[in-house]
């Protein structure tokens, strides 16, 4: 840990050689961004004093909530996340730290990450392990826990990462690791890959996370935990360990109600096929006797273990992640009292440096109270545009560096960066290339920046990337299209803040929430999206952005839905959005300010965490 430094302005971990530095006296100070370095240089003594007095020492007994997630993204340099679920978990813990919510996070340590992504010349995705050293970021803890997997005792150790809030309050994140001397080779590899391996591998990981996580918290001394929050069903086996512990304390009965009162469950999946299910033959072999099999079958389903059903049956508070997602989830699981708390993003993390400086100047205090961003309606338009031009220049410089393609600073730049999977319909905008070429000939230049990984076993997702790369080769300079490699949080920040328009085209109702448009709004970038997930709540047509199609779902076939949505996309792009961007800049700036004031001020994790505290943690 000697090589790890803390940014004195925001508290983020900085690895020497990757961040920025400044000299102060005889010290070298490290920063995660140019913005933080500039803020430090304004008042160096103040920030150094804050760094040395931060409250790292709150006792473990005071932690009241344990937040479990199979992936957590706290920074681009730690590959313990793959996409939206993990980034949301990281943003949640950051807001908990800012708001001083007594939470401890639990996840797995992925020594080889999700995967490192490269493309061949045709857009074929090639995967490799991510090389990183946990000791550069984390503190290894001495305690061990044990789980039984296929009648073997597997030792689990823990690493700790401190998520430091803007006030200095610390939320510890515990990362579980089976790479322990004495474990069998296969067991040591259980925490190597995120979403890797087969069903057997995935179930073993969920045993380590859910059962091992509860046991590790106990070993570490987190004795005051009152609520266990499962962020998606991967952690649901923790309810079995809670039942087991409850039975040890009260041998006369299985107290389902007492366990239920301690559990909170957030579901993120809008389709039945997305919920993990395991054959009971595998469950019996892998899990052993945490609780009697008939109890698992009673709570998790008769034919197979459905981890979502297990969590639903033993959680007092259950929620989807958007209003529409609540409705979809109630249809999937009738009879369960499913609520909704719409997702958000961590405002400080996802606001680029130029907009941070803008908000600091005109809306001081916004960082720890993002609701204040509603005041953005009065931001000077010239300053908003200058901040955007700076963000766009950073994106274009990155594109040039990575691809050699020189994009225009003046052309309408459309961004699309998210997981490459079929339902996201990343190539919908290219359904009729002639329409786009006609726009360019009419004086509306367009350029596109794409990024996103396809799961290694998702052949359709990989083919989607190849199709976009093929379109890029065909259009050449007429409509520049780039697909950037190795999408992560750092790349996401640059693409989201540097685009002029944020495109999102998921097939309805398959987007549970989505958060990239919320991040765009924090940087004054309006969304252009199908009405699904959070955008049903966030879209004010022509004010915060634009909708593609209506809210109707289902059709005779997917092709007719695609044709209808593509037609609406082209109609609005060529008749409303492009003319507004090129011919009515002042009106475009109104939309930018409204996206900040109406979307960023609400769709943030500070508001979201406050709702979890009120609705889920306190009752």
Stretch-by-stretch model annotation:
Residues 1-4:
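Short, flexible, mixed-charge glycine/proline-rich loop motifs
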Residues 7:
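Short cysteine-rich clusters marking metal-coordination/redox-active sites
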Residues 13-17, 34-35, 39:
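Cys/His-rich metal-chelating microdomains
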Residues 14, 29, 154-156:
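Short, isolated positions in well-ordered beta-strands
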Residues 17-20, 44:
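Short Cys/His-rich "knuckle" micro-motifs
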Residues 21-28:
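Short linker/helix segments within small regulatory modules
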Residues 30-31, 40, 47:
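Conserved hydrophobic/aromatic "anchor" residues
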Residues 53-619:
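Catalytic cores of carbohydrate-active enzymes across secretory and cytosolic contexts
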């Amino acid at each position: 840990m000697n090589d790890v430094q803390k940014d004195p302005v925001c508290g983020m971990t900085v690895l020497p050689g990757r961040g920025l530095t400044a000299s102060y006296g005889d010290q070298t100070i490290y920063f995660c961004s140019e913005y933080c370095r500039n803020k430090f240089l304004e008042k160096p003594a103040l920030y150094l004093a804050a760094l040395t007095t931060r409250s790292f020492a709150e006792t473990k007994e005071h932690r009241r909530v344990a937040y479990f997630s199979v992936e957590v993204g706290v920074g681009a340099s730690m590959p313990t996340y793959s996409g939206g679920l993990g980034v949301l978990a990281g943003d949640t813990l950051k807001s908990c730290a800012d708001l001083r919510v007594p939470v401890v996070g639990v996840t797995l340590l992925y020594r080889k990450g999700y995967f490192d992504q490269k493309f061949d010349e045709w857009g074929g995705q090639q995967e490799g392990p991510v090389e990183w050293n946990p000791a550069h970021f984390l503190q290894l803890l001495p305690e061990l826990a044990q789980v039984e997997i296929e009648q073997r005792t597997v030792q689990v150790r823990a690493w700790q990462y401190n998520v430091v809030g803007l006030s200095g309050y610390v939320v510890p994140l515990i990362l579980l690791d089976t790479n322990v001397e004495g474990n069998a080779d296969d067991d040591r590899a259980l925490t190597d890959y995120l979403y890797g391996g087969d069903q057997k591998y995935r179930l073993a990981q969920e045993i380590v996370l859910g059962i091992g996580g509860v046991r590790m918290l106990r070993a570490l001394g987190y004795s005051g935990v009152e609520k266990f929050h499962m962020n998606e069903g991967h952690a649901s086996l923790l309810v079995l360990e809670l039942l087991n512990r409850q039975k040890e304390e009260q041998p006369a009965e299985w107290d389902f109600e007492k366990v239920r009162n301690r559990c909170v469950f957030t579901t993120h999946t809008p389709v039945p096929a997305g919920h993990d299910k395991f054959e009971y033959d595998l469950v019996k072999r892998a899990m052993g006797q945490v609780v009697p099999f008939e109890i698992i079958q009673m709570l998790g389903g008769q034919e197979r273990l459905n981890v979502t059903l297990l969590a639903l049956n033993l959680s007092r508070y259950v929620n989807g992640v958007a209003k529409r997602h609540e409705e979809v989830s109630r249809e999937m699981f009738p009879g369960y009292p499913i609520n909704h708390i719409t997702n958000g993003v961590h405002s400080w993390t996802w606001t680029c440096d130029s907009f941070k400086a803008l908000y600091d100047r005109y809306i001081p205090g916004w960082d720890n109270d993002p609701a204040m961003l509603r005041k953005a309606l009065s931001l000077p338009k010239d300053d908003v545009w200058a901040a955007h031009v700076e963000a766009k220049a950073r994106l274009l410089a990155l594109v040039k560096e990575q691809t050699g393609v020189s994009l225009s600073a003046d052309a309408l730049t459309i961004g699309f960066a998210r997981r490459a999977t079929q339902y996201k319909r990343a190539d919908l905008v290219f359904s009729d290339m002639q329409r786009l070429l006609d726009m360019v000939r009419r004086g509306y230049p367009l350029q596109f920046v794409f990024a996103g990984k396809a799961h290694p076993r998702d052949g359709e997702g990989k083919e989607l990337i190849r199709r976009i790369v093929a379109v890029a080769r065909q259009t050449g300079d007429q409509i520049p299209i780039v697909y950037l490699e190795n999408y992560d949080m750092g790349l996401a920040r640059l693409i989201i803040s540097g685009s002029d328009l944020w495109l999102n085209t998921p097939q309805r109702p398959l987007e549970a929430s989505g958060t990239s448009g919320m991040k765009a709004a924090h940087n004054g970038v309006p969304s252009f999206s199908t009405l699904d997930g959070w955008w049903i709540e966030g879209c004010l047509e022509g004010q915060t952005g634009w909708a593609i199609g209506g809210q109707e779902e289902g059709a005779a076939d997917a092709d007719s839905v695609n044709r209808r949505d593509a037609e609406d996309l082209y109609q609005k792009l060529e008749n409303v959005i492009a003319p507004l961007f090129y011919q009515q800049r002042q009106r475009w700036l109104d939309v930018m300010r409204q996206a900040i004031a109406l979307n960023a001020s609400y769709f943030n994790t500070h508001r979201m965490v406050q709702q979890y505290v009120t609705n889920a943690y306190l009752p």
